[in-house]
């Protein structure tokens, strides 16, 4: 089993739900990315999603767009992100790392070269936002051959055919985008999420992580009641944007620990 599969199997055995925080590599400071990744793990992350900055992040809201712009301005590239993962792996061989980004940087490197470099760095999963599952069979096969889980998005608007297409190519987990629009949007409707997850699980035999619109411990706990994992990104990127640099890692770890406690509370049966 992959590191991601092992993580979700352990969570299921313990009756717990997963916490998947996202940060953008290189933001606010490329020299601090590995430290921030360790802060996420120390706060209780089960999987870390590491954003690969891109100049036109069409699925992302203004908070993550700004983080991409800052990282690119400081020279962050796909190669430097892979170096960050490799340095993280020197201390942490347990926490899975998923790269989340767009097709263009991967295609510039070439899928085969990327798969080899990502494997060697210690990457566990890849989510390419603009790769539709129907057109991703070759890419997904190359990732799996390198021991990397190809992860795909589903949304409230996803048809049964799209869900089935994801089921044919995805492994690790599925990321369910709980809202129409871009990351960071508000007005989360947990009941609508609960209604969609059975349709996903009937066609995709994988854990379902839910993200977009989760901003605090209360919403994280509510989502954990119905999903296998909670994905949170914009709120963390905003925290880093506003934090005093010397305090950023500690504040990040503290906020993630609050989310962890809330999610663990949701996973426990009532006394």
UniProtKB/Swiss-Prot annotation:
EC number: 4.2.1.20
Keywords (A to Z) from UniProt: Amino-acid biosynthesis, Aromatic amino acid biosynthesis, Lyase, Tryptophan biosynthesis
InterPro entries found in the cross-reference section: Aldolase_TIM, RibuloseP-bd_barrel, Trp_synthase_alpha_AS, Trp_synthase_suA
GO molecular function: tryptophan synthase activity
Catalytic activity reported: (1S,2R)-1-C-(indol-3-yl)glycerol 3-phosphate + L-serine = D-glyceraldehyde 3-phosphate + L-tryptophan + H2O
Keyword Membrane: no
Pfam families documented for this protein: Trp_syntA (PF00290)
Residues annotated as signal peptide: none
Organism superkingdom: Bacteria
Active site positions: 49, 60
Metabolic or biological pathway: Amino-acid biosynthesis; L-tryptophan biosynthesis; L-tryptophan from chorismate: step 5/5
Gene3D superfamilies, sorted: Aldolase class I
GO CC terms: cytosol
Family to which the UniProt record says this protein belongs: Belongs to the TrpA family.
Free-text function comment from the UniProt entry: The alpha subunit is responsible for the aldol cleavage of indoleglycerol phosphate to indole and glyceraldehyde 3-phosphate.
Oligomeric and partner information: Tetramer of two alpha and two beta chains.
UniProt-recorded name of the protein: Tryptophan synthase alpha chain
The species this protein was found in: Burkholderia mallei (strain ATCC 23344)
